[in-house]
Amino acid sequence: MKNLFIKGVLLSCLVSIIASCTDMKKSSSVVIDKDQIKKEIQERENQFAKLLNADEVKKIGYYADDAVTFYQNMKPLRSKEDRLEFFKDDLSSNTNKISFTTIEVFPSNDGIQVVEVGYYTVVDSTNTAIYTGHYMSLFEKRDGQYVCLRDMSASDME
């Protein structure tokens, strides 16, 4: 009798564990459309380039307020004001145009955060590439739109 009771308790525990694991698996399966995320990120990059090229830096909504940008050979830009000042200084002295190409995206399991690997090209007034390089950006979806939290770049030019 005692042996039968122990077997019953063990069987109940085993069934409970299996049932709870099965329920967790069902509830945590979120379908991530990597191609759609890549398209959304590329749209953000296109909008960012368009505003930079038009010298409309105050309209740039690409970055989150708490974003940090790591450019080469300078201290990280940690505030919106620092970033705006950098763009103003950079854009005021040239007529170059920049474009960004999303190469790969690596979304989190829930699609809220995305790491992007991309390529940038800066061309002069004759449409000749004068700077090229790669970048990595970390995006987070806030209020239904991806915003950049961290980014860094590396030039291909010597």
What is the predicted role of each segment?
Residues 21-62:
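Short, low-complexity N-terminal intrinsically disordered segments enriched in polar/charged residues
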Residues 74-76, 121-122, 154-156:
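Solvent-exposed loop/turn segments at secondary-structure junctions
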Residues 83, 87, 101-106, 118-122, ...:
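Hydrophobic/aromatic beta-strand elements that line small-molecule binding cavities or substrate pockets
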